[in-house]
């Protein structure tokens, strides 16, 4: 979720743009539609000559840090220059929650976020016999609000540049290990010192050191942390996810993609110093809007060779991983009753699929990649034209390219085992087997039981249902076939001539690691050994895994060092004129409310409830656009012309 908001004087308002909160600035820009048509014609209607493509000043985005907003540019573009009071209000009104952004929207601690950001937490507070995801939830009294476990909200109260402190701590470090240790020690010391300086005894505080420009700059972000957060309102899934996966990550959209929680301190609703007020006025097409949010991650400042590696290896393999898991889970769901948590996991996979489809498509887009190459060429020339920079950083682009070439040699192993220890994407039995092989190796080397305690816990792990475990194990064995090759020694040793489906069934029928209980018994009885079928699966890959782990770790460490030099070179050339890549920390992005050209027509700047009801009737009640029962007969006083979603030119990404 991100927040958009207008300057004081025009009236603060909130519109649901997959929940977006906005302050607007009225302006008289060149038609945003005309601008969008220009881009559309360049890239679609005309054949692009990549030799004539030129990079733009803001190709690396407009997600600004709060301590370095481009105020002169804002004033030039919008006739509006935010002052410190405005920026402070924007910062304090925004919140970071697990994986998402929220905002204070009432003087009594209500916070607004996206529907998908609340679904897993709604599942956590669901009671026996309930299905809050399907039915929605509304707490008619504060006493009825439900505290969400594992949920928190963080308010950014202070930002400080601590680059000099970190760099000073690294001066005497000579090796990679020494630098890493010194950096972590500096982070801890700075965090403790800055947290103690702001702690007023009212709530919890923590300081996080944010690395910007790949380590060229470091900022200390100090947060007030709220840990008593309670669910107050969640629309039904049919409304909060209206249009389903089809409409997700698209526009026009009509979903009421929102949820409300309330922050408490000492058992009472928190009264924030700043909150965003509601308004019925809204914005207009062409108005400037500013997004405040915590964008998760971007890779815009990477070199062309790094982006090509993403295109061919990392992002491509993650997209395939997600797509195959979606297929597996959907096949399982067709034949079995599934829980709300299962359904939410599937929705999350579909969300990631659309995200990475877009990334992979962009990385394969000749126009986009040509602009990136032009931007890199201009950067390289700027480095070479400065004698000092050329001496220090002239070879970094070739060094990074060489590292990518070496990483490609290990790509099949990386891809085959991608996220193999992730509980969302990977079989529990595979995760137990990876831990079990390490456990047995260290046990045979004489490690003490205390040293083995963490590995024992991983071997026992947590268990999925047998059906999902089998589904995910089968999918992983199919990955082995895809990346190692059906005729490879590894695949032949693991499958023994069986299909991935047959091999998964056999492993789960005979392995002590099939579930948590049997794994615990095997450890207690000391019967777990290398002959266990699941452990044998890992043993078949052990030589390759050892080589991969050693090489991959070294290459990544080298790349991090060179990337830090790249960041220092970029900062020396451009300073804060180029914003750093997203780091799931608070940013400010500027843009305009704008319609745009698509599919030979025009997407409106706003969608309304008229469109929502139109989709329900056009596609039918059993479609992804079917409304929940209580929404089928709205009261006569309900204005169907009320905007529900909007679109703008702001630079945002997930988070």
Regions found by a protein language model. Give the residues of each.
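Terminal presequence/propeptide segments associated with secretion/organelle targeting
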Residues: 2-5, 10, 19-655
